[in-house]
Amino acid sequence: MAVSMACARPLISVYSEKGETSGKNVTMPAVFKAPIRPDIVNFVHTNLRKNNRQPYAVSKLAGHQTSAESWGTGRAVARIPRVRGGGTHRSGQGAFGNMCRGGRMFAPTKTWRRWHRRVNTTQKRYAVCSALAASALPALIMSKGHRIEEIPEVPLVVEDKVESYKKTKEAVLLLKKLKAWNDIKKVYASQRMRAGKGKMRNRRRIQRRGPCVIYNENNGIIKAFRNIPGITLLNVSKLNLLRLAPGGHVGRFCIWTESAFRKLDDLYGTWRKSAKLKADYNLPMHKMTNTDLTRILKSQEIQRALRAPNKKVKRRELKKNPLKNLRIMMRLNPYAKTARRHAILQQLENIKAKEKKPDDGKPKAKKPLDAKTKMIKLAKAKKRQARAEAKTAEAKTAESK
């Protein structure tokens, strides 16, 4: 597959109706090198899609076609208006409110809503340029799901003879010769019934998108291709973003006729000259002409403008408690170590003095006993007395014998 060389070659081959190169080459238009901006494409696509909407609204009378009156307070029910009368389930039910069954909706829709959106012409052209540039990158085309594994080249350009086709069988044969029929097979395989209520609104079936055929003059090409499912036909002078980027996503597979491909430089111009067919229009410029950021930053021009790097590292100071950390306390109070050492020595001297204190013969004052200790001592004394009396009684008994 030759698609890996896309956008790298300055010349694009023109293919004949037999799927072979015709020997002619076309210069790659500058629009295919325009910046690809998916954000702009998505924004413009969203706003253009809104211009196809049809105004709708609910009836002004909806929810109010009944006689209902509030019962007021004092009935232990909500003050919502209630249907009058009796003899039916409807009587007494709430009415009018958006919380009621059969009531009107909240903020009923009106036909004078702001349906349409205005988009800047330059912004629309920027989006089309981005979509065209993306259609020349095989990776983006394949990411959209197009089957282009076997096609000879991207972008794919065919001879102008194709514009005079009038029969669908000729168009089918051309697609098969160009190896693009796999993309049509994908469309056939994707045809299915729509989910939801669109089935009731003339939108029963849905299918995937196929190739987009872009021509310069309609000499019968529309009749030849229009009945093939998935095919979209566009005039190169009236390129539509809704067709080039379906769903707001870039990467549509495009098949160009030779004259349409050559006309792109006149339509969008190059960076050296403005467009001939659009007044005062120039191609959007890239924000970066060189994508090698490392090379740009290390260039002499950038380095000369930059100041020298500041290598001074400022570390965060760790705060410590001087009452717990002696080293920090000594920094604040150099005498702290001496005072602490003096206190320790004084404590040792007091301990030694207590140990060496002589006994002067005076009876030491006894500590007063608490009630519990007194009871224990009294119980022990009674036990000793009982034991002594028992021994005395035994001794007397032995003597009498």
Swiss-Prot record:
Region (Disordered) residue spans: 351-401
GO molecular function, one term: RNA binding
Biased composition (Basic residues): 374-385
Keywords: Cytoplasm, Ribonucleoprotein, Ribosomal protein
Pfam families documented for this protein: Ribos_L4_asso_C, Ribosomal_L4
Subcellular location: Cytoplasm
Gene Ontology terms: biological process: translation
Any single GO CC term annotated in Swiss-Prot or TrEMBL for this entry: cytosolic large ribosomal subunit
Biased composition (Basic and acidic residues): 351-373, 386-401
Subunit architecture: Component of the large ribosomal subunit.
Role, per record: Component of the large ribosomal subunit. The ribosome is a large ribonucleoprotein complex responsible for the synthesis of proteins in the cell.
Family stated for the protein in its record: Belongs to the universal ribosomal protein uL4 family.
Name assigned to this protein: Large ribosomal subunit protein uL4B
